[in-house]
Design a protein with these regions (language model features):
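Non-catalytic C-terminal accessory region of glycerolipid acyltransferases
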Residues: 1-37, 244-252, 266
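Short alpha-helical functional segments enriched in proximate histidine and acidic residues
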Residues: 22, 86-89, 186-190
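Short amphipathic alpha-helix that is part of the acyltransferase structural core
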Residues: 56-109
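Acyl-donor binding region in acyl/amide transferases
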Residues: 94, 130-269
């Protein structure tokens, strides 16, 4: 809508017509997203959080809980709602009222809780891979990667991380750091875990050149090639001439130097 090559008056006319179409339950003129679900009751959330395992507290009195899904829970519904808000804010999101998937039912959820405003600040989804595979539960990352049997020692002592978010009103307030405090507390309770792994999403709003640089950098310094552990089901393909151009700037000789170069290149995009 915003990019239509027409004047403001014409845009207003089309937008008014779009709203009339919606009101009459007819096909809208513009593609729209599903409305995000209404917030859960704060009283019900507080009651449900009190039944979760408490594993930590931050200096500013945020509480860290571990939630295991059971039945129809306001916690899981609110996590799904806030995920959708956070991901839509960066041009992503499922397009649904809540962002939930089948894995949520048997993964654990690390939650940062604001006791004053009675709100979920953010969350991380955790998968204790040894326990999950013993129970024959599929890992989320198995939908993205092909693992070989040589990954077994890592699964036996591993924790899959993913689906992290912080709701926008708490951005810039150390919320992600606090979630990592919670991960540290979880690891302290499970000393067998030695390996953390999981997928990272690059937003489609990021310029392609920036994504190319990030993929090139991490393939250069942390490639899984030759390890015979894992391969991507949908590998990212760099432009044919990208290596020839990038290797003059990011050499692969010194990680710290290459990382500073990467940051400078990204800052100028």
């Amino acid at each position: 809508y915003g990019g239509l090559p027409i004047n403001l008056k014409e845009k207003v006319r089309l937008f008014r017509r779009h709203l009339y179409q919606l009101a009459k339950d007819k096909k809208p003129l513009f593609k729209t997203q599903t409305a995000i679900a209404h917030p859960e009751s704060k009283i019900e959330l507080k009651q449900a959080m009190s039944a979760c395992e408490h594993i930590g507290q931050t200096q500013d009195n945020k509480q860290i809980y571990l939630y295991r899904h059971q039945g129809s829970s306001p916690i899981m519904r609110e996590i799904g709602r806030l995920r959708e808000i956070a991901f839509r804010a960066v041009g992503e999101g499922s397009g649904n009222r809540r962002d939930v998937d089948p894995y949520d039912r048997y993964y654990e959820h690390l939650i940062l809780w604001d006791v004053e405003d009675l709100e979920i600040v953010g969350a991380y989804r955790l998968g204790n891979t040894s326990q999950m595979l013993e129970a024959e539960q599929a890992l989320y990352t198995q939908s993205l990667f092909n693992y070989t049997e040589q990954m077994t020692p890592y699964f036996d002592n591993g924790l899959e991380l993913g689906r992290s978010f912080v709701q926008p009103k708490y951005w810039g307030k150390r919320s992600l750091d606090y979630l990592w405090y919670g991960i540290g507390a979880y690891l302290n309770k499970h000393p067998k875990i030695r390996y953390l792994f999981g997928p990272v999403t690059l937003s489609n709003s990021m310029p392609k050149a920036a994504k190319d640089l990030l993929v090139y950098f991490y393939k250069l310094h942390f490639s899984a090639a030759g390890t015979n552990l894992v391969s991507s089901k949908m590998p990212y393909h760099l432009p044919q001439d990208f290596n020839d151009v990038a290797e003059f700037k990011i050499t692969g000789v010194d990680y710290k130097s290459d990382f500073m170069t990467l940051k400078n290149l990204l800052a100028n995009m």
